[in-house]
């Protein structure tokens, strides 16, 4: 165990054992599950954030080194120092909690497109939903469904946590943390640096809990993006009049016209033709 400047506890990966995962599984099951589109979700969720250092910052080929992968779940902050440790952490959680395609744990990341570029080198990604090249909104692997909380809130983490009344762990100053300092997985982190890491995942968790409760949502019903709220309200409003559905069916595109529009779009925007292959 290690402790932050404010004495918040962080569990190091090396402190974990099989008993911890069984206890975590029991605690999460006691909180219940939610169902959506033939999938079961644990009602509680996890948050994750990574910290990296850049080697060769002033060269043509800088290299990013991950030295911290922190997660927060059910009041516990778990710190992995390498991706290999994180892969093993998720593997043990998946096995103990019987995670699968139809029994999922949600993990929110506040800049998922960035973390995704690292994750794809260590995990087999089974599902990806993106709005455009490198703009990942959601992905799935090993029973864990990762979602981008920035797309949900449309706010930076500092603004999101500071605007949440019940958030106790707001994001700390990036200038004070000194991103230019070179750190590796073997670097001994100071209590202040640990506080920065802790607040990022704990604060995000606290802010998301408040948002979901305020909006009367859970992980199964909350939209993926901030615009999802608007689309949902529109669908509900349109459903009030049965004639709207009939008019929609009457004016919808047929396969031939849809094909023509798709072809025209590819001609106008050739670089967006197959953006998924750029991951």
Locations of the language-model features?
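Short hydrophobic beta-strand that contains or immediately precedes a catalytic carboxylate
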Residues: 47-49, 146, 279
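Anionic group-transfer/hydrolysis microenvironments
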Residues: 49-53, 111-113, 117, 150, ...
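A short acidic (Asp/Glu
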Residues: 56-61, 111, 116-123, 207-208, ...
